[in-house]
């Protein structure tokens, strides 16, 4: 079977995982990323990892490294303030395919995840990185774009897409919360929008807070005092 030559535009988590997956199939991958590695590592955010994601990382041979950097949570508290109802999901509620897992899921810092992906890419002989997209597109069997929400590639290729405005914005930050049960994540459904609290190490949580544009702006304008 002839090896495929593939160009990937963008090397964030999506583009990096795509490159590693295709390289595992012995495809020749050109990865275009104008940012320096330090800039790719600079985002201050966390990601939730599900059991499905874990199995994907296992297939890529990355899970052992990721698990060492991720923080596992054993319970998930789901609360709906609109109907005043809540439920706690535990690891023993997982499907049988995951019955050997003690954690319900995991949370990993962006920097830790990207460091693992970058190291894997740098050590892969099927992946070559370039900062500038100067190679003729005709030399590739496939070109794939993973260059963000406002994808320049999508605009260049004039790919139609639908967008809906929900009059909401998201604030994402880390905070120390004391007194909460250990290794518990929270998903809270509110009238203003959902609120997620993802546990990291040392009582630190990644907070993902959706609210109306006006409420979000008022929150951001609050004084530190």
Show where each model-derived region lies.
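Conserved N-terminal helical subregion
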Residues: 55-59, 69-156, 162-169
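Short beta-strand/turn micro-motifs composed of small residues
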Residues: 10, 33, 80, 175, ...
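N-terminal glycine-rich dinucleotide-binding loop that anchors FAD/FMN and/or NAD(P) in oxidoreductases
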Residues: 45-68
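Rossmann-fold NAD(P)-dependent oxidoreductase module
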Residues: 21, 120, 174
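Glycine-rich FAD pyrophosphate-binding loop
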Residues: 9, 21-45
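Conserved FAD-binding catalytic core of PHBH/FMO-like flavoproteins
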Residues: 146-225
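Beta1/beta-strand and adjacent pyrophosphate-binding region of the FAD-binding site
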Residues: 1-12
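N-terminal Rossmann-fold NAD(P) dinucleotide-binding loop
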Residues: 15-16
């Amino acid at each position: 079977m002839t090896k495929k030559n593939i160009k990937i535009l963008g090397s964030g988590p999506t583009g990096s995982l795509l490159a590693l997956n295709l390289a595992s199939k012995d495809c020749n991958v050109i990865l275009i990323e104008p940012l320096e590695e330090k800039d790719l590592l600079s985002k201050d955010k966390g990601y939730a990892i599900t059991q499905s994601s874990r199995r994907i990382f296992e297939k890529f041979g990355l899970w052992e490294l990721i698990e060492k950097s991720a923080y596992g949570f054993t319970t998930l508290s789901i609360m709906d303030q609109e109907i005043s109802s809540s439920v706690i999901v535990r690891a023993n509620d997982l499907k049988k395919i995951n019955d050997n897992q003690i954690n319900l899921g995991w949370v990993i810092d962006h920097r830790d995840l990207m460091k693992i992906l970058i190291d894997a890419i740098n050590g892969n002989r099927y992946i070559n990185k370039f900062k500038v997209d100067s190679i003729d597109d005709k030399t590739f069997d496939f070109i794939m774009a993973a260059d963000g929400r406002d994808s320049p590639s999508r605009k260049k290729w004039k790919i139609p897409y639908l967008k809906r405005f929900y009059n909401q914005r998201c604030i994402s930050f880390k905070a120390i919360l004391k007194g909460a049960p250990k290794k518990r994540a929270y998903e809270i459904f509110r009238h203003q929008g959902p609120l997620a609290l993802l546990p990291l190490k040392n009582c630190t949580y990644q907070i993902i807070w959706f609210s109306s544009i006006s409420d979000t702006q008022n929150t951001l304008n609050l004084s530190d005092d």
